[in-house]
């Protein structure tokens, strides 16, 4: 028998009450985006569960995609069969014979939304249970935590049978918590921060700073590839490339070496905040982890944060590096992140950066520069690209490949 659909059980949506349908509709849109690589697959949702109709598409491929979509608590592949007792008996016997192994226990869980069906739920449980015993006489029934819980649902159009319950990604549907700007470098931490923000329903746009010729086309492609890895959790992501060469050259010329990193990060924060404002974002997200590098001490964070009143979300701030690496490997960004391309945060990194920068000092050094003009020119020069889950590359990547 071939699976015909996958039944979706929602995650935290069950707590949303009045906003429930808004969350469900967003989850439906996200599933349609991610599953768009399977042209025959269709998605339907209602208040209680979702349905992914396979229409002949390979179940295993679709299931792997569903495992990554936030807002799904669990899902079950189902067989669609004709709605009569004889057909149900034969289907249940065939399924149980194929999955049973010595010593396993089972139960039948039947329910019907079509109350015109000839048997009620209790009678159907008994009938199908007897059918299993007739082909597997040594099997034992167990009502609590059986090895096989065969679920039979009688709907208006057909009957559906399932026995697997596969854990989903949990979390909230991407986009239900508003939009945030992810400061995406080429490192290990920021893609993980983006993933964790997506899990809590934040619709992210990736802001990446490029400083050619100091940063290479390879570094830009690396950032594109990291963004594409994140699209499998909720669909398309807008990638925003910011020209940053002029600012970094200005900082290097006008400021003491020990303050280069602090000033660089303050400019990045200003620009990201300006982009957030222009694009109706609510928060800024970054991959800072407390104490990991010089710019991530509390004193440094305070000095950098001082340029904005916008909330800054740091999903990995309390994690050890190995914890972050574990997540990066899980979401398949680690191998990309360790590719040896320098980014804006490393090209002019001082040997001994200031770990406890004073805000008044940073403000004094910034008076040597046209801060507003530099920010305005950077924001005016941004390039926005849509990164899609189904594409192996895009026009910008093709151009980068030519340059490489």
Curated annotation (Swiss-Prot):
GO terms classed as biological process: thiamine biosynthetic process; thiamine diphosphate biosynthetic process; thiazole biosynthetic process; tRNA 4-thiouridine biosynthesis
Domain THUMP: 60-165
GO MF, any single term: tRNA binding
Assigned keywords, A-Z: ATP-binding, Cytoplasm, Nucleotide-binding, RNA-binding, Thiamine biosynthesis, Transferase, tRNA-binding
Listed Gene3D superfamilies: 3.30.2130.30, HUPs (3.40.50.620)
SUPFAM superfamilies given in the database record: Adenine nucleotide alpha hydrolases-like, THUMP domain-like
Record: residues binding ATP: 183-184, 208-209, 265, 287, 296
Gene Ontology cellular-component annotations: cytosol
Principal EC category: transferase
Family: Belongs to the ThiI family.
Main function: Catalyzes the ATP-dependent transfer of a sulfur to tRNA to produce 4-thiouridine in position 8 of tRNAs, which functions as a near-UV photosensor. Also catalyzes the transfer of sulfur to the sulfur carrier protein ThiS, forming ThiS-thiocarboxylate. This is a step in the synthesis of thiazole, in the thiamine biosynthesis pathway. The sulfur is donated as persulfide by IscS.
Protein name: Probable tRNA sulfurtransferase
Provenance organism: Streptococcus agalactiae serotype III (strain NEM316)
Source taxonomy: Bacteria, Bacillati, Bacillota, Bacilli, Lactobacillales
Protein's gene: thiI
């Amino acid at each position: 028998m071939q699976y015909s659909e996958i039944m979706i059980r929602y995650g935290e949506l069950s707590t949303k009450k009045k906003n429930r349908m808004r969350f469900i509709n967003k989850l439906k849109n996200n599933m349609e985006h991610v599953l768009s690589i399977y042209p025959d697959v269709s998605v339907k949702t209602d208040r209680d569960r979702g349905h992914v109709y396979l229409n002949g598409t390979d179940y295993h491929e679709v299931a792997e995609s569903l495992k990554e979509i936030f807002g799904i608590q669990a899902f079950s592949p189902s067989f669609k069969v004709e709605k009569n007792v004889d057909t149900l008996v034969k289907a249940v016997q065939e399924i149980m014979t194929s999955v049973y192994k010595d010593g396993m226990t089972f139960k039948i869980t039947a329910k019907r939304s079509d109350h015109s069906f000839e048997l009620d739920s209790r009678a159907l449980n008994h009938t199908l249970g007897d059918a299993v015993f007739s082909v597997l006489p040594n099997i034992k029934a167990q009502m609590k935590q059986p090895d096989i819980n065969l679920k039979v649902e009688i709907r208006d159009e057909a009957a559906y049978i399932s026995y697997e319950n596969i854990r989903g990604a949990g979390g909230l549907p991407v986009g239900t918590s508003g939009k945030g700007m992810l400061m995406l470098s080429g490192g290990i931490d920021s893609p993980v921060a983006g993933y964790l923000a997506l899990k809590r329903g934040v619709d992210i746009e990736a802001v990446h700073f490029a400083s050619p010729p100091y940063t290479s086309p390879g570094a830009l492609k690396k950032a594109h590839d990291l963004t594409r890895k994140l699209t499998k959790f909720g669909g398309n992501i807008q990638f925003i490339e910011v020209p940053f060469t002029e600012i970094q050259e200005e900082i290097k010329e006008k400021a003491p070496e020990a303050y280069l990193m602090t000033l660089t990060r303050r400019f990045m924060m200003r620009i990201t905040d300006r982009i957030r404002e222009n694009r109706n974002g609510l928060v800024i997200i970054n991959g800072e982890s407390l104490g990991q590098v010089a710019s991530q001490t509390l004193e440094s964070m305070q000095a950098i944060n001082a340029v904005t009143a916008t909330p800054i979300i740091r999903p990995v701030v309390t994690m050890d590096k190995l914890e972050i690496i574990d997540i990066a490997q899980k979401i398949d960004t680690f191998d990309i992140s360790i590719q040896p391309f320098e980014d804006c945060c490393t090209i002019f990194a001082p040997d001994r950066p200031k770990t406890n920068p004073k805000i008044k000092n940073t403000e004094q050094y910034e008076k040597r520069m046209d801060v507003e003009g530099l920010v305005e020119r950077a924001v005016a020069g941004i390039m926005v690209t849509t990164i899609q889950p189904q594409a192996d590359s895009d026009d910008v990547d093709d151009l980068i490949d030519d340059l490489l």
